[in-house]
Swiss-Prot record:
Homodimer. CDD domains: AdSS. The active site is at residues 13, 41. NCBIfam families: PRK01117.1 (NF002223), purA (TIGR00184). Its EC number is 6.3.4.4. Pathway: Purine metabolism; AMP biosynthesis via de novo pathway; AMP from IMP: step 1/2. It is an enzyme of class 6 (ligase). IMP binds at residues 13-16, 38-41, 130, 144, 224, 239, 303. This is Adenylosuccinate synthetase. It is found in: Cytoplasm. Mg(2+) binds at residues 13, 40. Plays an important role in the de novo pathway of purine nucleotide biosynthesis. Catalyzes the first committed step in the biosynthesis of AMP from IMP.
């Protein structure tokens, strides 16, 4: 019986929501281990659509324990709002169904304001953040001045911690010509939220250790994608946390030995939201067709996603940096009807062929994709639930991708519906 880590193998938006929902039916515990409420996912359960951005996917399923780990940055107001939205849809999430690590750093209004101020002032050099305060909150965590969930327990000690935080932030705000934050007002705001969020607080490391010893199946759910990792992604056009699979351990308080199987969610083509390099991006009619057929708009931001052909170089690199055992290939049906399909199998950099994606920003912008072409298919793959249902050319495409990235397909998704899935290998039976 294995514990499973799910990560996106590209720039996010690979279809993790459906796969995690499908896996969460088998899991006993579902854990979010990094990120914040900047990465949304959509679930369809019993015909009802749920849009989540902070809570783990298992939260909409009765009998599942959902956990937010210490690697997440938590906006307490966003948590309260998301819980209220679920309540309005008939899903009550009490402390018996959700636990949050006591050492989770909080996103405060000043983080959101700073995020927006920086992004709006960075004309021409924007990173493409969602302006939800994720980056500034992680900065405070690393700077050892963050307000953490457990800090809300003691009202007498909280003001001194807020003063220490504001020594840093008000200095920045003065430099930006923005009104300073009143310490008492921030303390009052936090203490007003405390009764709404503290009932969910727990020692998550201890809770997960007990779950492991009790033989529970644990699903670790990553947000975004590995190419947005702060170290291994397309820096500086990345998120502010480690999104690779190994961060599931540090971001939830378990040892690396608790991670048995890594499933990489991989789109059958490539998309990206926001700024940054994208070697296979298509700005022609083909790119528009991929975007239209794939309904490529961000769940959180509503921004249209940039679209391009599958990049085997990037995914092969992610397979290595994440230690991926198998991939879940999604949105194969979007490629239905193309006469031919291209795949990037290498790059040219300054006239030289390379088989990796460089770390330096200038080199990332200069790489040119080397394509190979495969015959497309006219028959539909939508709704296929077995290999026999797929056109021969589609099967050939899938096998070709396996060969190029050096990793087998464990799951194949052929539509947004959770049952339209071909299971090759169950990750929980690793």
């Amino acid at each position: 019986m294995a514990n499973v880590v799910v990560v996106g193998s590209q720039w996010g938006d690979e279809g993790k929501g459906k796969i995690v929902d499908w896996l969460s039916e088998q899991a006993d515990v579902v854990v979010r281990f990094q990120g914040g409420h900047n990465a949304g996912h959509t679930l369809v359960v019993d015909g009802v659509t749920y849009k989540l951005s902070l809570l783990p996917s298992g939260v909409v399923r009765p009998g599942k324990l959902s956990v937010i780990g210490n690697g997440v940055v938590l906006d307490p107001q966003a948590l309260v709002d998301e819980l209220a939205r679920l309540e309005s849809q008939g899903v009550h999430v009490g402390p018996d169904r959700l636990r949050i690590a006591e050492n989770t750093p909080l996103i405060l209004p000043l983080h959101r304001e700073l995020d927006a101020l920086r992004e709006n002032a960075s004309e021409g050099t924007r990173i493409g953040t969602t302006k939800r305060g994720i980056g500034p909150a992680y900065e405070d965590k690393v700077g050892r001045r963050a307000i953490r969930l457990v800090d809300l327990v003691d009202p007498k000690a909280l003001p001194a911690k807020v003063e220490r935080l504001l020594t840093h932030h008000n200095l920045i705000r003065r430099g930006l010509g923005v009104e300073e934050v009143n310490p008492q007002a921030l303390v009052d705001e936090l203490l007003a939220l405390a009764p709404k969020v503290l009932p969910y607080m727990d020692r998550v490391w201890e809770l997960l250790d007990k779950a492991r010893k009790d033989g529970k199946k644990i699903l670790f759910e990553g947000a975004q994608g590995a190419l947005l990792d702060i170290d291994h992604g397309t820096y500086p056009y990345v998120t502010s946390s480690n999104t690779v699979a190994s961060s599931a351990a540090g971001g939830s308080g378990v040892g690396p030995g608790a991670l048995d199987y890594v499933l990489g969610i991989t789109k059958a083509y490539t998309t990206r939201v926001g700024e940054g390099p994208f070697p296979t991006e298509l700005t022609d009619e083909v790119g528009k067709t991929l975007g239209t057929k794939g309904r490529e708009f961000g769940v959180v931001t509503g921004r249209p996603r940039r679209c391009g052909w599958f990049d085997a170089v990037l995914v092969r690199q992610t397979v290595r940096t994440c230690g991926i055992h198998g991939i879940a290939l999604t949105k194969l049906d979007v490629l239905d009807g193309f006469d031919e399909i291209k795949v990037c199998v290498g790059y040219k950099l300054d006239g030289k062929e390379i088989d990796y994606f460089p770390s330096e920003m200038g080199a990332q912008a200069r790489v040119e994709p080397i394509y190979e072409t495969i015959e497309g298919w006219t028959d539909s793959t939508a709704g296929a639930r077995s290999w026999a249902d797929l056109p021969a050319e589609a099967v050939k495409y899938v096998r070709w991708l396996e060969e190029l990235i050096g990793c087998p397909v464990a799951v194949l998704s052929t539509s947004p519906e959770r049952n339209d899935t071909i299971l090759v290998h169950n990750p929980f039976q690793a």
